Amino acid sequence: MTKVGFETKNWVYTGSNLAPDKEKIEKMRKDFADKNQDTFSFIAIDKKNKKIVGSMMSSFKKNGRLRHRIGMGWGIHPDYQGKGIGTKLLKESLRYAKKKGFKRAEAEMAIENKGSWKLALKNGFKIEGEKKKALLTDDGRYVDTYLVGRML
């Protein structure tokens, strides 16, 4: 069996421990579109080996009372964490969202994923709440999450 993407225990949005590759991102886009949502994504690629080393996806409602905000999710390959890739992806995503007229950005991440919530806080997000046992991991553990948000 061939794995796609890359291993990261804290990835939330794929339903597995694999951060998405290009095909998974396209499938996620289609799934969002089927639910009256749309997405935009930014991907970091290592120039030397041409592999995806990080991704940032934002989803949004096309109409209704939630149309002013985006929900964000990201994953950075463990070998590339701490090198500013997440910061660059997040800043570019926020810049693009603001340019498109969105007013608010939100994300949810495992509390044990310190790198993720530190990235969010460093970029102006505030912790707005906690959810107990919000995620069920592939190995059967329940994980608490932070809800973070910021205005653009």
Locate predicted features.
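A short, well-structured alpha-helix characteristic of acyl/acetyltransferase catalytic modules
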Residues: 1-19, 23
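Conserved catalytic-core motifs of GNAT/GCN5-like acyltransferases
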Residues: 106-109, 121, 126-141
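Acetyl-CoA-dependent GNAT
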Residues: 18-79, 151-152
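Conserved acetyl-CoA pyrophosphate-binding loop and the N-cap/start of the following alpha-helix
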Residues: 80, 84-92
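Conserved GNAT acetyl-CoA-binding A-motif
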Residues: 90, 97-109
